């Protein structure tokens, strides 16, 4: 079966730049990679075809030979040069596949924030801090205890027994990665012997057993600013896990979680609460005290107030942590129906009900609803 033109395989023009070639190849590699298409022979063949095309066209000398003589110019069996599999001037597939694998798995190779071998940054930590509403609104100082990894003191974080030191890994030569040949291309992976550090411990420290770090719990003081809310994060720089091989320490992120309040519900900078009132206060009007985070305030209830009526107390909400004026407190009225009535109270209510008969002006919503019901059944 005749081979397809390499430019056609990659879907580019003959005069395409190196960047365009790389972009086209990366797109095809992502699409047809075996990890994305398990047990798909067609995709596997397309992947190999794209790999072969890119290895030729990304090498200046091979590309020149191909442009002049076609496949014969690069096929060793026909006297062409090079072949495939990575001579010194071959394509740098490790860079491309590093990008491809990053897209597959959501991160770079080697993990942890370090480079190839050598020092690596310590991991960041997360601590969930529970606060009540008053603490979140006003701010507070809290001591927390966090389990973490710190540098081993006897070996000063090297992992090697005192008087000795780590040695260069003979498997990877101190790089921390090894190259694996897979068909037409080679990829790099973490060295299985040194686990990416580039060095090995021949005489490990007795305290940390060669790890260079030990577990320890630290007590830290956290200053919580006023106005924080659930999901807000406070970063404590350098309070995460210690790095390895002398790498920098990670950070600690304190994540705020505000517990539910018995009276108030919070929505951003505004607070909400339900205010129960008697039906007599609702009908006749009155004045009552309602709670706020700053103490009690008087709320005037106009006569004829209905359940669901909302009263706004301006500035009685929360001042946001990122600045701006305080929000409001929204008071939702809930009219209570009296229970456990005495005989005299029932008599008075009966008299009151009788006095309302045939006078719909006292209950405009109810009269309108009943009129709607009558029209509904009249239309059936």
Swiss-Prot record:
What are the boundaries of the region Disordered?
A: 224-245
**What are the ranges of the CXXCXGXG motif repeats?**
152-159, 169-176, 191-198, 205-212
UniProt keyword Transferase present: no
Which free-text remark accompanies the cofactor?
Binds 2 Zn(2+) ions per monomer.
- The UniProt annotation places Zn(2+) 1 binding at 152, 155, 205, 208
Q: Which SUPFAM superfamilies match?
A: Chaperone J-domain, DnaJ/Hsp40 cysteine-rich domain, HSP40/DnaJ peptide-binding domain
The J domain is annotated at 5-70
Q: List the GO terms this entry assigns under cellular component, sorted alphabetically.
A: cytoplasm
Q: Care to name a GO molecular-function term for this sequence? A: heat shock protein binding
Its primary localisation, in coarse terms, equals: cytoplasm
ZnF CR-type residues are: 139-217
Q: Which cofactor does it need?
A: Zn(2+)
Extract one GO BP annotation from the record.
Answer: response to heat
Q: Where does Zn(2+) 2 bind?
A: 169, 172, 191, 194
**Keyword annotations from UniProtKB, A to Z:** Chaperone, Cytoplasm, DNA replication, Metal-binding, Repeat, Stress response, Zinc, Zinc-finger
CDD domains (UniProt xref): DnaJ, DnaJ_C, DnaJ_zf
Compartments in which it is found: Cytoplasm
Query: What protein family does this chain belong to?
Result: Belongs to the DnaJ family.
Q: What is known of its domains?
A: The J domain is necessary and sufficient to stimulate DnaK ATPase activity. Zinc center 1 plays an important role in the autonomous, DnaK-independent chaperone activity of DnaJ. Zinc center 2 is essential for interaction with DnaK and for DnaJ activity.
**Protein name in the entry:** Chaperone protein DnaJ
Organism, per UniProt?
A: Pseudomonas savastanoi pv. phaseolicola (strain 1448A / Race 6) (Pseudomonas syringae pv. phaseolicola (strain 1448A / Race 6))
């Amino acid at each position: 079966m005749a081979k397809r033109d390499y430019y056609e395989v990659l879907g580019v023009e003959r005069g395409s730049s190196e960047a365009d070639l790389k972009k086209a190849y990366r797109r095809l590699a992502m699409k047809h990679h075996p990890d994305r298409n398990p047990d798909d022979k067609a995709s596997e063949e397309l992947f190999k075809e794209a790999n072969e095309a890119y290895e030729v066209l990304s090498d200046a000398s091979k590309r020149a030979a191909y442009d002049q003589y076609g496949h014969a110019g690069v096929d060793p069996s026909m006297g062409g040069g090079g072949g495939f599999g990575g001579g010194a001037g071959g394509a740098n597939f490790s860079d491309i596949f590093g990008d491809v694998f990053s897209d597959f798995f959501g991160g770079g190779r080697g993990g942890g924030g370090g480079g190839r071998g050598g020092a690596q940054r310590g991991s960041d930590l997360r601590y969930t801090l529970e606060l009540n509403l008053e603490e979140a609104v006003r701010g507070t100082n809290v001591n927390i205890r966090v389990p973490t990894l710190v540098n081993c003191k006897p070996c000063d974080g090297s992992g090697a027994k005192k008087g000795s030191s780590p040695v260069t890994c003979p498997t990877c030569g101190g790089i921390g990665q090894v190259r694996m040949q897979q068909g037409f291309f080679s990829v790099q992976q973490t060295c299985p012997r040194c686990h990416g550090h580039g060095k090995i411990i021949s005489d490990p420290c007795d305290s940390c057993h060669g790890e260079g770090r030990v577990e320890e719990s630290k007590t830290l003081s956290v200053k919580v600013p006023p106005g924080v809310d659930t999901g807000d994060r406070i970063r404590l720089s350098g309070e995460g896990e210690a790095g390895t091989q002398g790498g920098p320490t990670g950070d600690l992120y304190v994540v705020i979680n505000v517990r539910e309040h018995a009276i108030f519900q919070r929505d951003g900078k505004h607070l909400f609460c339900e205010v129960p009132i008697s039906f007599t206060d609702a009908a006749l009007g009155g004045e009552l005290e309602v709670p706020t985070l700053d103490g009690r305030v008087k709320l005037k209830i106009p006569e004829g107030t209905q359940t669901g009526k909302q009263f706004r107390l301006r500035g009685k909400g929360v001042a946001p942590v990122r600045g701006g004026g305080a929000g409001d407190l929204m008071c939702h009225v809930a009219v209570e129906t009296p229970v456990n009535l005495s005989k005299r109270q029932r008599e008075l209510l009966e008299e009151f009900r009788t006095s309302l008969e045939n006078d719909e002006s006292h209950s405009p919503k109810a009269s309108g609803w009943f009129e709607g019901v009558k029209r509904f059944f009249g239309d059936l």
